[in-house]
Amino acid sequence: MTRIVIIGGGPGGYEAALVGAQLGAEVTVVDCDGLGGASVLTDCVPSKTLIATAEVMTTFDSSYEELGIIVADDTPHIEQAARVVGVDLGKVNRRVKRLALAQSHDITASVTRAGARVMRGRGRLDGLQAADGSRKVVVTAADGTEETLTADAVLIATGGHPREIPDALPDGERILNWTQVYDLDELPEELIVVGSGVTGAEFAGAYQALGSRVTLVSSRDRVLPGEDPDAAAVLEDVFRRRGMNVMARSRAQAAKRVDDRVEVTLSDGRVITGSHCLMAVGAIPNSAGMGLEEAGVRLKESGHIWTDKVSRTSAPGVYAAGDVTGIFALASVAAMQGRIAMYHFLGDAVAPLNLKTVSSNVFTDPEIATVGYTQADVDAGAIDARVVKLPLLRNPRAKMQGIRDGFVKILCRPGTGIVVGGCVVAPRASELIHPISIAVDNNLTVEQIANAFTVYPSLSGSIAEVARQLHTRKRAGEA
């Protein structure tokens, strides 16, 4: 029986374990924290659970008056009025941890039910490949005891951890990274969020919705520099309109506690203060101390593991998946990398990883979902595409729900009308992007999308309307 050892129990690891076991291999998963990895225990699942509460708060705050809702105490609408609803952050965070642990237990049950073995500990490669093609993996348990496993193939799926600034080290109380925020029992009165990427933007929006006064420190010209510029502009406008202090072109250099306050020093000498500070300045791959280079595994300068499109590393019999590869920090991509690795090694049919069909979402309010080629690709000349953007303000369902911010954007080939990308900014954009994802994955045309029935009224009607406009322009261009 083929022996496979998987180091790391996140989406890349546990999905690979399920596939490997189903294909008849003897699979061992080595994990030190609990299956699900950071995605389930400290990152994706916890943050989206927190955001679920924030979403309810935002929806109510922004639309209850327009929709004719009167609160029980008949609170009048005055400038700087007290909020009519509040949040118990301790209760929210207890729910966050409870759901994360439940999800981890469910994953463990699925993996063991499939026939895989789960070992608690840290794994490292022991030297080069043996003459028979096998490899040794040393597992160190929490008590220091070691066990050596023999594997025909090894998958590295160890994820990453929060990057730290030397002069702004988290203390777990006032200066926090994103794994520590769920230990808070009280809502931060004034939260400084350092970093305006996906993690920073999500937490800044969530805590503002929960009731904190938020300052977002961005070293770039705008929030979410890696996202569609139109989408980022909408979100930044929403943030500012709701009272967030967004500081663009401001790089944090240091953060320190002063009694019960935090002082953040910017690179230009300015100092801002708050009750708490959240550092969201990227992640570092968990690739150190694993004997990777000694085993022939090539690392990039960033510490990420180099892989090809079927998850192979430079070392025979060693594969890698997930955040440790630095390819695309998404649970869905990690899971696909892990599955591809197993299919490839075990001789099953496999399609190489295609990042142009990956859909992603920023869980702010509104959400920002994208798939395929982007506006930046078009602007840079990477692809010739027609682009139509339709504001949600014109959508009847959006009007009924009091939705003012957002749009649907679709990109298609000029000649054929084949859909090559899209961006949706809306509540639940993560759900609305799916039909565009299907179109990108299956080379569907804007005509096919336009001809499909949509419910009236619905936000998805805007997707069909954008497709109709693109199809009309295509026909006009052919005339």
Residue spans for each PLM region:
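Short hydrophobic core segments
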Residues: V5-I7, G123, T148-G159, V193-V194, ...
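Glycine-rich flavin
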Residues: T2, L18-A25, V30-L187, T215, ...
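Glycine-rich dinucleotide-binding loop and its adjacent helix/turn
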Residues: C44, I156-R213, V217, V246, ...
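FAD-site-proximal beta/loop scaffold in flavoenzymes
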Residues: G172-P188, V271-G347
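General small-molecule cofactor/ligand-binding pocket signal
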Residues: R117-M119, L176, N245-M247, R386-V388
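Beta1/beta-strand and adjacent pyrophosphate-binding region of the FAD-binding site
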Residues: M1-G12, L187-G197
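Flexible, glycine-rich terminal cap/loop adjacent to redox cofactors
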Residues: V5-G12, A16-D33, A38, V45, ...
